[in-house]
Amino acid sequence: MAKVTDFKVADLSLAEAGRHQIRLAEYEMPGLMQLRREYAEEQPLKGARIAGSIHMTVQTAVLIETLTALGAEVRWASCNIFSTQDEAAAAIVVGDGTPEDPQGVPVFAWKGETLDEYWWCINQIFSWEGELPNMILDDGGDATMAVIRGREYEKAGVVPQPEANDSDEYIAFLGMLREVLAEEPDKWTRLADSIKGVTEETTTGVHRLYHFAEEGVLPFPAMNVNDAVTKSKFDNKYGTRHSLIDGINRATDMLMGGKNVLVCGYGDVGKGCAEAFDGQGARVRVTEADPINALQALMDGYSVVTVDEAIADADIVITATGNKDIISYEQMLKMKDHALLGNIGHFDNEIDMHSLLHRDDVIRTTIKPQVDEFTFPNGKSIIVLSEGRLLNLGNATGHPSFVMSTSFADQTIAQIELFQNEGQYENQVYRLPKILDEKVARIHVEALGGKLTELTKEQAEYIGVDVAGPFKPEHYRY
């Protein structure tokens, strides 16, 4: 392989440490390793040029090397300013080479990026020499949004100026687009024409995709990986159940037993949060807007309350809604002195971080990286993790390898599906076919030593399915 010269990571000398962790993770990621074996000769992604934007973790490193093992070329950035594991990023750049002669994949990611640096990195995954990228692998929808809004502003001939209430992140995003428009005035239009499809990892990004489709501005097919059963019911719930506690422990060493905890949101992620705290002996209450989810919480044994009535005596508050404006500045003023506030939704707008970071009468004291104390005019203070961003990735290393194996196997299969079937999908949002979802589950059942019951032909006919599956209709709720 040729020497990699186009990259930006923290420190290539970390590559050996990263490689050891990647090697161990491979044993815990049977889905990806099985796909490597199954498709080694076929090379179904040969010719794919993937612009990837997912947290640059050890588990993502195994995904990247699976994509390249199946024939793809890849450029990568993280989808969060705090989530990169620098040793994993270094190992992927070095590849089979050395720190002095790196021969891996171009990566643009390091832990602790500024917002301007973050959007610079996103731009880099689309800046290929020669041919343009033809696939996007996204988490949160930022890479996809860059192409869609970039093309829109190219057509208008101008990038709009930020408005007074725009977030710092959106201001940085517009700044990146403005610079690109000045240097390459047709870049995003050419990219939109080149991309065959996007596969999206998370709930927030899927919401964006459906919004773009409704607007009529989605320029290529999109695969909703998040709502694959082997993603949402495993990564979102069981992964969160593990990594939330890991993040809080690494950040604070706080004992959770006996504490009053408020979990905002009771979707798959919120369910994982509530179970995690319950398992630690905490007293858990839940907020929820959807009556079905609220009823589930009640039946699972949790009180369902509003933020206003519960925040004053909560020791820990966690947002997990995927929505915005969940915890306001005024509500933070009511919190217990030294209460803990964190978020495990994709973006930082669930908590009013803008007020915390920009008010002159709020004093910020950094305890350690991604752990800050904010002191209010009333003398009370709260501890905020990862500046309101994903605490499980900012304060820890995210979900464990095995559960990410299911998600990333889904991503790999979705990339193959869209890349190999160009023209068969319209510019809409699709779910991963059920038979492929079941394939991913089957691999992991076997890896855990489970033995599946095989239906007889008569049994399969009786319930109207094929002996080999799929076993459930699309509308089935697991």
UniProtKB/Swiss-Prot annotation:
It comes from Corynebacterium efficiens (strain DSM 44549 / YS-314 / AJ 12310 / JCM 11189 / NBRC 100395). It catalyses: S-adenosyl-L-homocysteine + H2O = L-homocysteine + adenosine. Substrate binds at T57, D139, E201, K231, D235. Binds 1 NAD(+) per subunit. NAD(+) binds at residues 202-204, 236, 265-270, 288, 323, 344-346, 392. Pathway: Amino-acid biosynthesis; L-homocysteine biosynthesis; L-homocysteine from S-adenosyl-L-homocysteine: step 1/1. NCBIfam families: ahcY (TIGR00936), PRK05476.2-3 (NF004005). One of its GO terms (molecular function) is adenosylhomocysteinase activity. Its EC number is 3.13.2.1. GO terms for cellular component: cytosol. This is Adenosylhomocysteinase. Belongs to the adenosylhomocysteinase family. Its cofactor is NAD(+). It is found in: Cytoplasm. SMART domains: AdoHcyase (SM00996), AdoHcyase_NAD (SM00997).
